[in-house]
Amino acid sequence: MKILLFTQYYPPESVGPAIWINELVQDLIKRGHQLEVLTAFPNHPQGEVFAGYRGKIFQRGEENGVEVYRSWIHPPKTRRFWQRVLSFLSFTVSSFFYGITKIREVDVIYTVLQPLSLGPVAVAVGKKLGARVVLNIQDIHPYAAIQMGALKNPFLIRVLEWLELWNYSHAD
């Protein structure tokens, strides 16, 4: 099966999600699947795009036997809520354009749903390609942000709750 793994975090980043996602990719390859990855330029946790990746909007290349599509991101300079939102949205928009124009012939789009805004991108690319969409939900959004006190705006909470339900109802 040909699988596109869609995630904001991927090596050479060394944060938790990038590590387990890389392990998942390697395990699926060992099981005989073909893998491609659509991800952001590495920037976490420093908040700046890593050397060797700077100054690019898109990049395609093979990394450890995997075709990796990297898409522009505005790295968050701080851990502040709105900086992270801007970062999430920048990757959402750039990955939509890259995914819809460059990804070809996949059977499944396995999406790590952080941020929530990646769901509609995965669904749009999946519809274009006739691929099934699987969501991997790591955090309970938007409830984690609400509980931490980072999200208090009632309108924004309703929008994110709507997006959460939309994602669940449109995944395969």
Give a label for each model feature.
Residues 31, 100, 117-120, 124-129, ...:
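Membrane-proximal helix-turn-helix segments that form the acceptor-binding/catalytic region
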Residues 34, 67, 132:
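Residue-level detector of anion-binding/catalytic polar loops
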Residues 39-94, 98, 103:
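A conserved catalytic-core segment of Leloir-type glycosyltransferases
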Residues 15-16, 47-48, 80, 119-123, ...:
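Short glycine-/acidic-enriched loop or helix-start segments at secondary-structure transitions
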